[in-house]
Amino acid sequence: MAIKTDIRGMIWRYPEPFVVGREKVREFARSIKCDDAACYDEAAAAELGYDSLVAPLTFVSILAKLVQADFFRNVDTGYTTMQMVQVDQGFTFHQPIKAGDVLYARMEIASVNERFGADIVTTRNILTNAGGDIVLEAFTTMMGHEGDDSVNIKWDAESGQVVRTA
């Protein structure tokens, strides 16, 4: 196992709050071709009972990328070169993400395992608001190996799995 198992149980807090901008919500909604009026128009959001624009569900990917990059930049995981693929992810929204929200992110390393020469890491990712309430809980599973591309993986449509080819 190339990854350091002592990261298991680690809690990584993103160092800065993430402020959800109104124009960022609109820009993101346009980029994914979201046609929900509550993402663009405050009156439409108010009709649904919200006090500001509602971000599309996948908006959280913006912050998730920042948190993950910050973690790998600052934590010695044991990898010097790394090939990694995300193999699973699940979300539980406790409340919507809205323009004006101030969010705080933490990533917990829930498990670190080795299977068939690949390191498998599962993270529990929590977003809280300024009041400390949980907004989102997500679990992400990543598979990686250290070294070059001599070990190849590909998507096998027949089995619905990521498989090794060499």
Question: What do these predicted regions represent?
Answer:
Residues 1-86, 153-166:
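Hot-dog-fold acyl-thioester-processing enzymes
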